[in-house]
């Protein structure tokens, strides 16, 4: 095996000790000499594993409270030496080859995430020697093996056992990629953290006090690392290539973390639409169903159970529901699953959990993509990204949602209790409809959805048309608008359609005129003070 390289000497130095003792014992059993530092060396020695301190190997002690341990020619020369080329130099400088390095880095992310972390705390958790060894070993992957993830220990041991104590070039190259990904992510975290510390140009003798009292939410340069989950057949259109990347630091229930139980591979559009459906259904605590088509909800309802919620959501717009995405906020049962597959063609069904009986029902439609995303307790604070040509827009996720005690009735007429319940339901749906968004609802069920029109009044007209097409009664329905009404024409159109009350953010320079129009029609109007544009 021409590219095999034997492991005779290894350097182990890890902050996360998971699996390192077992790994060291396995290396020792194969005759590998072990070098180590600090806590890792003590752990091995305390458990009877022969180990040589790096300071003994180099003949130079650790200095500066451990800041300098492995930054030495006998370490990096041993790692970077090209086998078959640098032997004479190594002999002249008494450098011994180091064939394997297992390193993970100081816990910078965990440190800065702690409440009360100071800049000094962060600085002391910036690893220097570790990344240097990682990069050196990865650079020389032709001859040396680098491990930065504990889950690779068993893989390397198995390969050594199968190859007379050696690793293959294929494995070393794959591990080198992981190593460069690891150091890139690590440096990115550090750059992001420091980039939020904006100097106040103070002459204060204390460096830490010379930083602004409040950090900037957005660093000077933004670094992130996404991991490819899958290659996609094509992108939004068949002439576009695509792949799906995920943020491994987010553990919130999402399309990115969902497990596919059956069906064809998810497409680009499937993933985007499933995200829209799932994020919408998360807003509801009662059994709810959201049906999405082209990133817009076309039917949303709550019910006593999922079957009722699905039947009511489907009733809103059966035509658009064809080939749609269906999301639930509770365990999918067999009865609801049967109603779906018997009634309509569906691309994706996603729920926190899917019972075995429901799986068996959906299995009859082998192409249907069935996803289980897990329960969601809390939403993760994270950023939204929007790509523009030559740049990237970053913002907080829109996680805002007003409660009953936060809205303000601005009309003369007060909404009834039933109307207020429908208003809050309708407002949650409007948040996930493309702007300009108008949603009609009655009895916790959408009646019509007007999405993406350039004029708000035309979105209202579309919602009315959709309701009429399906024979749904608009009279005494409620209406939600994702942003304020600039003119009274939207109110007049709503009144003509039979809308009884409206929920909207308010904030127009013509608010008084808008409120007067509502009063003129005997409508109730509620302001939320919060807009939900969605583009």
UniProtKB/Swiss-Prot annotation:
Keywords, alphabetical: Hydrolase, Multifunctional enzyme, Purine biosynthesis, Transferase
EC number(s) on file: 2.1.2.3, 3.5.4.10
Entry keyword annotation includes Aminoacyl-tRNA synthetase: no
Pfam families the record matches: AICARFT_IMPCHas, MGS
Chemical reaction(s) catalysed: (6R)-10-formyltetrahydrofolate + 5-amino-1-(5-phospho-beta-D-ribosyl)imidazole-4-carboxamide = 5-formamido-1-(5-phospho-D-ribosyl)imidazole-4-carboxamide + (6S)-5,6,7,8-tetrahydrofolate; IMP + H2O = 5-formamido-1-(5-phospho-D-ribosyl)imidazole-4-carboxamide
Coiled-coil stretches: none
GO term, biological process aspect, one: 'de novo' IMP biosynthetic process
Superkingdom of origin organism: Bacteria
Pathway entry: Purine metabolism; IMP biosynthesis via de novo pathway; 5-formamido-1-(5-phospho-D-ribosyl)imidazole-4-carboxamide from 5-amino-1-(5-phospho-D-ribosyl)imidazole-4-carboxamide (10-formyl THF route): step 1/1; Purine metabolism; IMP biosynthesis via de novo pathway; IMP from 5-formamido-1-(5-phospho-D-ribosyl)imidazole-4-carboxamide: step 1/1
UniProt xrefs under Gene3D superfamilies: 3.40.140.20, Methylglyoxal synthase-like domain
GO molecular function (one): phosphoribosylaminoimidazolecarboxamide formyltransferase activity
Gene Ontology terms: cellular component: cytosol
Recorded family membership: Belongs to the PurH family.
Comment on protein domains: The IMP cyclohydrolase activity resides in the N-terminal region.
Protein name per the record: Bifunctional purine biosynthesis protein PurH
